[in-house]
Amino acid sequence: IDLPDGSMIRLTIARYYTPSGRSIQKPYDSTVDYNKDLIERFNHGELMNADSIHFPDSLKVQTKKLGRTVYGGGGIMPDYFVPIDTTLYTDYHRNLVAKGAVIKFTMQFIEGHRKELANKYKKFESFDEKFVVDDDMLANLKEIGEKEGVKFNEEQYQKSLPLIKTQLKALIARDLWDMNEYFRVMNTTNESIQKALEILNSDEYQKKLK
């Protein structure tokens, strides 16, 4: 399937295995059980705290070469655990998104500044480095939110402010360029992505491959 950004998705029913023979997929014989498992893991705190994840000893296996402890049972426990950060997500932010205030603001802003943005930022790298979501833009967003029935909450607004700024910048980048640029902006606040990049560029990771 060809996608608008030039990438492609390939659907398959095949299973994928790591070099040590572990399937990266969980068993999904039952759709209900598969979805229920994710909900139970979230409620149990497994996505927020590594200490909440427990494996029975029967699933533990030592790799022959490096002697690392890995686990069977379907799916993979990562070598590095990055907890989900839920502090940025508030009801106020969710309502701004759900009521369409974020998209409406973005569309209005771009239509009012398209020529200016195109002339000022010829390349995404320049936009990424220099463009800043300022106070006037945020005030406009709050105003649109009020008109859409989203009651302003100062405490929740301050908590979600870093996410709101990143999201607005990413949506503007998407309109000016494409989805690749959208994710390049959004991923700056994605702790899993940032941790992965840190590890992949470290000597410690290279040692694990030997």
Model-derived segments and their meaning:
Residues 1-33:
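Conserved phosphate-handling catalytic cores of large alpha/beta enzymes
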Residues 23-24, 28-210:
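Conserved functional hotspot residues or short segments at active or partner-binding sites
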